[in-house]
Amino acid sequence: CRQCNKKISINYFFVELIIGIFFITIFLYTSNYFDFILINLILILFLIIFFIDLKHFIIPDILNFSLIFLGLLKNFIPTKNLNFNYDIEQSIIGGVVGYLTIWIIIFLYKKLKNLDAMGLGDAKLMAAIGTFFGLKSIPLILFFSSITALLIVLPSLINKTRNLKAEIPFGPYILISAVFYYFYGDKIYQILLI
């Protein structure tokens, strides 16, 4: 940095590169400006949450509440991106169930082990995801985020570079799973229902 003479983290370069790639991809993928703006806002918030939770083990409320607001707002704007749910009732139910699912996990783990399994930031993030995709997305996104976390963390547990009591930010895995669900959720449900 020219101002403070400190080294700028390489993470900033990657974040800006990822945003640029997303921006171009979304521009080519979307058919109208409402979709373009909405999806870009969502992905920018996802990236900010991803890196903040990864580094600081916290998801600021302002980011979660911004996502929840966008998840509810999308029901009223003239866009019909088929990968989102467009029923306000389903958005609200999805948000409530997303929040309560994580809250119950936190509550039960606290009762059984007297430890915090996750933070309420993860619960609010699942509420936001529920507002975008509705109730049916919650089990699949939680399943995929748990499997993704396990696959990424398991090698460090086997190598003993991390122990079972180490903090693991769960938000990034929820976000990865939400993006996966955005593209493949309906296809997976079609396979499961066959």
What are the language-model segments listed below?
Residues 1-12, 104-118, 155-164:
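Cytosolic, membrane-interface loops and tails of multi-pass inner-membrane proteins
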Residues 1-33, 190-194:
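N-terminal transmembrane signal-anchor/hairpin module of polytopic inner-membrane proteins
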Residues 9, 13, 32-36, 61, ...:
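Hydrophobic, aromatic-rich alpha-helical transmembrane segments
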Residues 22, 26, 30, 73-74, ...:
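Alpha-helical membrane-inserting segments
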Residues 41, 48-148, 191-194:
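Functional transmembrane core segments of multi-pass inner-membrane proteins
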Residues 119-121, 155-180:
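Interfacial loop-to-transmembrane junctions
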Residues 136-166:
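Conserved post-catalytic alpha-helical subdomain immediately downstream of the catalytic base
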